[in-house]
Amino acid sequence: MLPFSLLWAVRPLQRCGPLVRTAVRAQHGKAAQTQTGEASRGWTGQESLSDTDPEMWELLQREKDRQCRGLELIASENFCIRAALEALGSCLNNKYSEGYPGKRYYGGAEVVDEIELLCQRRALEAFDLDPAQWGVNVQPYSGSPANLAAYTALLQPHDRIMGLDLPDGGHLTHGYMSDVKRVSATSIFFESMPYKLNPQTGLIDYEQLALTARLFRPRLIIAGTSAYARLIDYARMREVCDEVKAHLLADMAHISGLVAAKVIPSPFKHADVVTTTTHKTLRGARSGLIFYRKGVRTVDPKTGQEIPYTFEDRINFAVFPSLQGGPHNHAIAAVAVALKQACTPMFREYSLQVLKNARAMADALLERGYSLVSGGTDNHLVLVDLRPKGLDGARAERVLELVSITANKNTCPGDRSAITPGGLRLGAPALTSRQFREDDFRRVVDFIDEGVNIGLEVKRKTAKLQDFKSFLLKDPETSQHLADLRRRVQQFARAFPMPGFPEH
């Protein structure tokens, strides 16, 4: 019997017919030693990763083991479904296809044309969009390129934009700049002004947003977040945009899966353009989508002439040729697979469970005396404010990492340091994909609480962050506490199934 590594290499070839199977056998038999010409060179490209690059294979297996034995709580991460990973690792990686379906700059694109059109159709279907009123570009490489392409299409250089401030839960691509530096390319190429949370409620301050917009007169307002646990009032933001004659762009990268499942409100009723990633709550491969309105925008009251939206050509041109070259056809296919899944009843059940698990996690944290920004959650994440506990997110993140719990430090409203921010962001999507339920998340909070208490104890004995990190590794008693907690976390985590390939 062939070894597993060889079976894995041959398996996909068995669909290609007898000639391919014979060729593969010849490469490993006596015929391989007597062949002449091209075939005698021996290389076929059919060698497995484990045979060709054992070092990389070992690293992949280590990462797979890390994911299986740990608790993944980073809100922007999820576990991609196996079917999408198969598309991602397919022959589509080989095909170059600059341009759009039917208008390529390369030949041999008839199949990838069908794949891209299928992805477009599924994207519109997933969000119940009328093709006469909405279009979608599925070529952006990820969320940040999608946002920059949308800005390029909608704005002129140095036009004004408004987005939620990064320390208040916004994203870098929404125009972030510090007091001394324009950090994001968005703030370099455009003039940005942040809107913020109400420090008392932890909610977006829509009144202040409106006041700022009236003074700043932005051309674009971005409704999107990366660390905000509540729902966005898209209708209110539409009112502000209409008042100041601005476009409304909804960045639903974090919540698009929840929107597709119809478990939270959709931005499409109010937005002009909607962008998203595809690997977070959509549970697909890493890529980006840009949705845009099309059809009739308004009717001229004097002439009665219909005035159409002009987003389609501008957005398509911004993606290609302005910012990208050939699309990643393997990623587009993988996204199409995930979008098909997003239309199923099973995906809606998953999304509902994400919300239940996030609320269970929030309630368990509150019961243990933790402070949450905004006091709770309406979506897939919670933002814990550790400052009342006397700890910061950087120290908590490191302790949890050492016990196989992966979370990320995050700024809270009022934070002055991104190195030692006061918050810890926790998300439910990834562990929900491993079939965690509410009681499981309460157990996860027990582990987190143990880790935070270890962090508090070590902080009392150290000064600087680097001293804190060194003490965790060098103090025998602390190391023992960490090892015990890590053992229990890993034992708990390994009992749950993992999507994707079994070995890597």
Curated annotation (Swiss-Prot):
Q: How is its activity regulated?
A: Hydroxymethyltransferase is inhibited by succinylation at Lys-280.
Reactions performed catalytically: (6R)-5,10-methylene-5,6,7,8-tetrahydrofolate + glycine + H2O = (6S)-5,6,7,8-tetrahydrofolate + L-serine
Q: Which GO terms describe its biological process?
A: glycine biosynthetic process from serine; glycine metabolic process; L-serine metabolic process; one-carbon metabolic process; protein homotetramerization; protein K63-linked deubiquitination; protein tetramerization; regulation of aerobic respiration
InterPro entries membership:
PyrdxlP-dep_Trfase, PyrdxlP-dep_Trfase_major, PyrdxlP-dep_Trfase_small, Ser_HO-MeTrfase, Ser_HO-MeTrfase-like, Ser_HO-MeTrfase_PLP_BS, SHMT-like_dom
According to the record, the signal peptide region is none
GO MF terms listed in the record are: chromatin binding; glycine hydroxymethyltransferase activity; pyridoxal phosphate binding
Q: How does it assemble?
A: Homotetramer; in the presence of bound pyridoxal 5'-phosphate. Homodimer; in the absence of bound pyridoxal 5'-phosphate. Pyridoxal 5'-phosphate binding mediates an important conformation change that is required for tetramerization. Interacts with ABRAXAS2; the interaction is direct. Identified in a complex with ABRAXAS2 and the other subunits of the BRISC complex, at least composed of the ABRAXAS2, BRCC3/BRCC36, BABAM2 and BABAM1/NBA1. Identified in a complex with ABRAXAS2 and IFNAR1. Interacts with KIRREL3.
The record's similarity note reads: Belongs to the SHMT family.
Q: What is this protein called?
A: Serine hydroxymethyltransferase, mitochondrial
Organism, scientific name: Oryctolagus cuniculus
Q: Which gene encodes it?
A: SHMT2
